[in-house]
Amino acid sequence: MEFEFDVHKIFLEPITKLDNNLIPPRRPLISSSEAQKQIMTVIDEIGKASAKAQRLPASITSASRMQANKHHLYILKDCTPKTAGRGAVIGFLKVGYKKLFILDQKGSHIEAEPLCILDFYIHESLQRHGFGKELFSFMLRNEQVDVQHLAIDRPSEKFLSFLRKHFNLWSTIPQVNNFVVFEGFFRDRKASVKKTPAKRTEGEIKPYSLTDRDFLKQEEGLPWPLSQAQINLNRASSLGSSPTRACSRPPPGEEDFVKSLRNCRPHSLQRAASSEQEDHSQRRRTSEMNLSRGLLAQKNGYSRYLSPPPPLLTQGPYAAAQIKEQQSRTDSSAQEGRTQDRPNGSNSQHQNDLISSKQHVQDLHMELAAGRTMSDLKEGQNATKSPWCDHPSYTVLGTVLNAAWVKKKQELRSTRPW
C-alpha cells in the first residue's frame, strides 16, 4: 500500500512497533508534528483496507482507537528496491491484553488476561510470500509469548488456515464469546489464571447481605417498644445533674429504633412512645376543662333563654342593698301592671302561681351558684333574699315544665322574645 509521502522517513525499520502514543522507537527524519500526522494517516488507511478485506461494516483499527487503548501495532513496510522511492506498507498486526472468562476442557470458567490478536492484515497482492509469518514471528519474539497461549478475536478462515500451516494449531476449545483458543492454552502459562467460584444454587441465595444476617443474629430479645430493658444514657451525666423521674421510660436508642423497623407498622413507634404521656395529659386536660366549664356555667347562670345572670349570694353589704332596691322596683312595677291589665280576681291566682315558680327557680339557682349543701343553702336563703325570687325568670333548670306554664308566665311579663 503506497502513500503520497515517503514511508521510509517515518518508519526507519522493516517492522515498527507503535503504542498509544504513536511514536516509533527511532526518531523519524522529519519534524515530530509532520511525522505524527503521517503515521495517523497510515494507520487509518490500513485499518480501512483490513475492514474491507474482512467484510466488516466499520474499521476496527484507527489512530483514535490506538490512542484510546493500550494496544500494540506492528507495521511491516516493503524494503525491496522497486519501492525505494517512497516505500510501501505491506501489512500490520494489532495485539493487546484483555481480561476474559474462558472455558477449559471440563467446562469450568477461568478468569485470565491473555495476549489477544485483535487485527491482522496483509495486502492482497503480497499474500503467500512469507510476509505474514515474518510479522507474526517478530511479534511473538517481542512479546515473549508462545503461540498456543494466544486468544484470537473472531479469526477468519484464512487466518485459521495460516495458523494450522505455520504453527500447527488444529484443535480449538469451544467458547461462549467471540475469542478462539487452542489446546495447550492452559499448559505452561507464565501469566496467572484464576478460577471463578462455582455458582450457588437457588436455595443458598438469601434476601439479606452478610452484614444484615449478622445483624439479625444479634436480635435475641424482643424489639423495642415491646422490650422494657433500661438504656443508660451517657449524655445525661455529661450535661449535669438533671433529675430523672423513676416512672418515665428512657428514650429509645438508635439500635432499638432500627430493630423496631422490621417488626412495627408505620407510625407505631411514635404512638407507642407518646401513648403514656398523651393518655395522662388527655385525662388531666379533660377533667380540668369539664370542671372549669361547670364552675363557669354555675357562676354566670348560663341558660338558653337569654335571661340576665343572677347575682352571687356572697357579694357583701353593698350588693345586698342593691338587691333590695332592685327587688322593690320590680315588685312595684309588677303590681302596677297587674292592676291595670288584669281584674282583681285573677291577679291573686296568678300571683300565687308566680310565687311558687319563683320559689322553685330560687332553690335551683342557690344550688348551682354556690355549690353548697342543702343545709347551707337554707341558711343563706333566710339571711339574704335575692330580688330574683319575686321576679319571673325565663331560665328553666332542673325539671322540664309544660308549654302552658311557660305561656302563662309570658303573659304576666307582657314581653315575648319570639
From Swiss-Prot:
Specifically acetylates 'Lys-40' in alpha-tubulin on the lumenal side of microtubules. Promotes microtubule destabilization and accelerates microtubule dynamics; this activity may be independent of acetylation activity. Acetylates alpha-tubulin with a slow enzymatic rate, due to a catalytic site that is not optimized for acetyl transfer. Enters the microtubule through each end and diffuses quickly throughout the lumen of microtubules. Residues 1-186 form the N-acetyltransferase domain. The keyword Membrane applies. Acetyl-CoA binds at residues 120-133, 156-165. The record marks 54 as: Crucial for catalytic activity. Its EC number is 2.3.1.108. This is Alpha-tubulin N-acetyltransferase 1. One of its GO terms (cellular component) is cytoplasm. Residues 329-353 have a biased composition (Polar residues). GO terms for biological process: alpha-tubulin acetylation; microtubule cytoskeleton organization; neuron development; regulation of microtubule cytoskeleton organization. PROSITE patterns: GNAT_ATAT. Belongs to the acetyltransferase ATAT1 family. It is found in: Cytoplasm; Membrane, Clathrin-coated pit; Cell junction, Focal adhesion; Cell projection, Axon.
